[in-house]
């Protein structure tokens, strides 16, 4: 999946804004948004929030999970656990990047948040690569990759073809070995049932 498509999907996440204008509801393809009342929070798609913010028509309210205490806790849990922590937002990287790049003044401790979110992403990416490597070396048939986001899966796409090719070769080798073993067993069974099968012990 192309990164632009992942961003497009992430931009559909709903986020709160505080508009500085009033307007009746906007009727979009997937439903109405609004009404807009100056000074009152309203949830809109992320793409609309960034568009209005660039026009200085609103202030973006960062999601609750964009908080240093929450993100530091997620970071520590990610480091402790061998599994992937369930993230508070499936598109956390897309949302964080767009909000912080569009409206840094609306995000308390913006640079610190940017750093800890990047740390979380790097830890998860490293864990994902390690999981895939262990999966290959262990000749496994499946890997537990729950709670990954689309962007994280996309980040390891370059090594997936090699991984799948390695697994396919292993499976072909295992199948051939099993077939040869079965043929040898059948051949030995046939020989042992012949008239001279006990000739070595009959002397």
UniProtKB/Swiss-Prot annotation:
For this chain, the family text in UniProt reads: Belongs to the GINS2/PSF2 family.
Q: Cellular component terms, GO, for this chain's entry?
A: CMG complex; GINS complex; nucleus
Keyword annotations from UniProtKB, A to Z = DNA replication, Nucleus
Job of this protein: The GINS complex plays an essential role in the initiation of DNA replication.
Q: Which InterPro entries match?
A: GINS_A, GINS_bundle-like_dom_sf, GINS_Psf2, PSF2_N
Q: Where in the cell is it found?
A: Nucleus
Keyword presence, Nucleus: yes
Provide the leader sequence positions: none
Keyword Transferase in annotation: no
Q: What name is this protein filed under?
A: Probable DNA replication complex GINS protein PSF2
Its GO biological process terms? chromosome condensation; DNA replication initiation; DNA strand elongation involved in DNA replication; double-strand break repair via break-induced replication; regulation of DNA-templated transcription elongation
Provide the primary localization.
nucleus
